[in-house]
């Protein structure tokens, strides 16, 4: 599915929450990301209720070396070597769609979630004057970062939020910069898993994308560490961006 005007390097293919193959691939990518892989059951429930949509990020023919990039991704993550099939039977708000049944090799994913008043009030937003969608679950293969795919995905889901869902704001959250960029945190989250260190923090990157911080919570996430299963509360910054 093309979202932005003009040729695009990414297609955004709906995740089929009814497919064991799609659910398992999402688990593999979340585990590779190192972040909230244990939430897949919640993803299925939210998608089934029409409140959330997950999109696979799939390279298009606009990428000159598409096959080589897919091969690079698979070499890094061999469990993803078999292509999925576009089988999602619905899109937003349970709207029926006709799947293409074409093979696809997703190199990441991103999600949009419609926010209810109960979601907005705790972070200080007025549900009476704001219709918001939350952007989350953004993941681009560590083997293919620095190609601009993350920024492209953000612009696309912002467009979907505004044009298809009628939202005037996108919100998101991430770990605060001071925590993420600590040496011990980067060693545990990136180096130990064989992944490159981030060039900038998530916080700085979202600000670069036009978002502003409006709320912080020192115990925003209860995170389960992939290496030993221990849990820790993490400090979180909440961001917003007006779409119109």
What are these regions (language model features)?
Residues 1-83:
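Short amphipathic alpha-helix that is part of the acyltransferase structural core
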Residues 98-99, 110-128:
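A conserved beta-strand-loop-helix scaffold within acyl/acetyltransferase catalytic domains
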Residues 103-107:
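Glycine-rich acetyl-CoA-binding "A-motif" of GNAT/NAT acetyltransferases
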Residues 108-110, 133, 138, 237:
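Conserved GNAT-family N-acetyltransferase fold
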Residues 126-142, 173:
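Conserved acetyl-CoA binding element of GNAT-fold acetyltransferases
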Residues 140, 146-160:
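Conserved acetyl-CoA-binding loop-helix of GNAT-fold acetyltransferases
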Residues 161-197:
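Conserved GNAT acetyl-CoA-binding A-motif
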Residues 173, 187-228:
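Conserved catalytic-core motifs of GNAT/GCN5-like acyltransferases
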